[in-house]
């Protein structure tokens, strides 16, 4: 009985993880281009916070960083 509960929990966790990861990836061409541009621009920002996080241009300008 305990094994069945363990495997049921494991199956649900894997299904939820795959659903979340599938939803996080854009499926249209423009979405993929934005994702690729974001990854390239992320390393070019001067602000240490913006290097780690995805900041909107208004945040970067307000904090004195180079906007994306």
Swiss-Prot record:
Keyword check for Disulfide bond: yes
Protein family per UniProt: Belongs to the conotoxin U superfamily.
UniProt subcellular location: Secreted
Tissues expressed in: Expressed by the venom duct.
Top-level taxon of origin: Eukaryota
Protein name from the UniProt record: Conotoxin Vc7.4
GO cellular component: extracellular region
Primary location group: secreted
Propeptide boundaries: 25-45
């Amino acid at each position: 009985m305990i094994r069945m509960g363990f495997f049921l929990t494991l199956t649900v966790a894997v299904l939820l993880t795959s659903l979340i990861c599938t939803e996080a990836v854009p499926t249209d061409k423009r979405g993929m281009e934005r994702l690729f541009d974001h990854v390239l621009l992320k390393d070019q920002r001067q602000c240490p916070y913006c290097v780690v996080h995805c900041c909107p241009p208004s945040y970067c300008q307000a904090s004195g960083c180079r906007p994306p």
